[in-house]
């Protein structure tokens, strides 16, 4: 009875471990998430470098503006070369603003990706916390099952000890019964069974089918 109960509890614990996700799946998800975060931070680092390069372009362009203003103040006489330089300047300015437009588009895409990443990151850690809480509850349930199983094992061990004591008592009774049987047999042989028949006829009653008296003083049994 008790081994069956213990086996049933152990079977339930094994079935629970097969149905529920193992800790290795959660660990793989964590590793994959950390790799994605590392790649995203590398991309963020590259984008910061682009921002610094763009700032350098801005300062360089401001220097050109100041130089151009100086040329306006110093070379009014040389109007034609000035207009040629102005034409070149406006071309450079157009290129600069196109570069800025491209940069703003890239920045917009980056921040969109950034928001998506943090939304996914938040959802991931929420799911991870739920898995961790479930694993913790399962560990507590497993601990309770093991404690109950341990109690069953202790109870079964006590029952086995009692059963062993009963077998020892029964064995002792069998040994006493065999000793009495041997003693009765010896008395029967040494005292002369036929001599005792007449004396035991009136005491023990009629003979049985094997011509032996019905003895009531000694039990006859075997171990």
Curated annotation (Swiss-Prot):
Residues 199-223 are annotated as: Disordered. Keywords: Coiled coil. The keyword Coiled coil applies. Residues 129-153 form a coiled coil. One of its GO terms (cellular component) is plasma membrane. Residues 203-223 have a biased composition (Polar residues). This is Coiled-coil domain-containing protein 70. It comes from Mus musculus (Mouse).
């Amino acid at each position: 009875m008790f081994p069956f109960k213990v086996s049933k509890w152990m079977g339930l614990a094994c079935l629970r471990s097969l149905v529920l996700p193992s800790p290795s799946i959660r660990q793989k998800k964590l590793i994959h998430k950390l790799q994605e975060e590392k790649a995203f931070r590398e991309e963020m680092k590259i984008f910061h470098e682009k921002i610094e390069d763009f700032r350098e372009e801005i300062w360089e362009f401001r220097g050109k503006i100041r130089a151009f203003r100086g040329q306006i103040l110093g070379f009014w006489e040389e109007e034609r070369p000035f207009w040629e330089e102005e034409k070149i300047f406006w071309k450079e300015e157009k290129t600069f603003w196109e570069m800025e437009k491209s940069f703003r588009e890239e920045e917009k895409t980056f921040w969109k990706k950034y928001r998506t990443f943090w939304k996914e990151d938040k959802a991931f850690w929420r799911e991870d916390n739920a898995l961790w809480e479930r694993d913790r509850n399962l560990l507590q349930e497993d601990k309770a099952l093991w404690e109950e199983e341990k109690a069953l094992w202790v109870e079964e061990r006590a029952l086995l000890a009692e059963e062993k004591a009963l077998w020892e008592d029964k064995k002792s009774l069998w040994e006493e019964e065999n000793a009495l049987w041997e003693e009765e047999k010896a008395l029967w042989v040494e005292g002369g069974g036929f001599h005792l028949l007449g004396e035991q006829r009136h005491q023990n009653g009629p003979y049985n089918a094997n011509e032996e008296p019905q003895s009531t003083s000694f039990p006859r049994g075997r171990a």
